[in-house]
């Protein structure tokens, strides 16, 4: 189980790296799906299946809509692939920044290779998922308001970008 959780963590980091290097929106969607599935699987292994399911539905549902808009706007006849030198350079630069930041910040010294799962506590482990909805609405009200405001702002930004030059502030002279 530990190796599987570490594999999910590696897939999460590689999926995030694939989204961050962003050679083309076509390939960014693949990285987004890999990172989302791996992250939700990681949360599932920690015992928070309700949070994992909610994040999976909301994140993939919302972000794939944004990627569909960006794919429809960026109609490249020859999109850049992950094998291009520029994209490989971006990926290597991101990995280098992560490694240097970990060494300088001292995170490498405190990292222990063990992963604690939900079943490691024996019979008396309390699963965090039993109070999932109650915790969302009691302790997470402020975060819900911030996330809702951010999603509303993102919706208006995407709608403004998709609208184009029809009635926007940028006009032809």
From Swiss-Prot:
Domain of life of the organism encoding this protein: Eukaryota
GO molecular function, one term: NADH dehydrogenase (ubiquinone) activity
Localization, UniProt: Mitochondrion membrane
Catalytic activity of the protein: a ubiquinone + NADH + 5 H(+)(in) = a ubiquinol + NAD(+) + 4 H(+)(out)
Keywords: Electron transport, Membrane, Mitochondrion, NAD, Respiratory chain, Translocase, Transmembrane, Transmembrane helix, Transport, Ubiquinone
Keyword presence, Ubl conjugation: no
Keyword Translocase: yes
Broad class of enzyme this protein falls into: translocase
Enzyme Commission code(s) on record: 7.1.1.2
InterPro entries, sorted: ComplexI_Subunit6, NADH_UbQ/plastoQ_OxRdtase_su6, Nuo/plastoQ_OxRdtase_6_NuoJ
GO CC, alphabetical: mitochondrial membrane
A Pfam family recorded for this sequence: Oxidored_q3
Protein family (similarity comment): Belongs to the complex I subunit 6 family.
Protein name: NADH-ubiquinone oxidoreductase chain 6
Taxonomic source organism: Larus canus (Common gull)
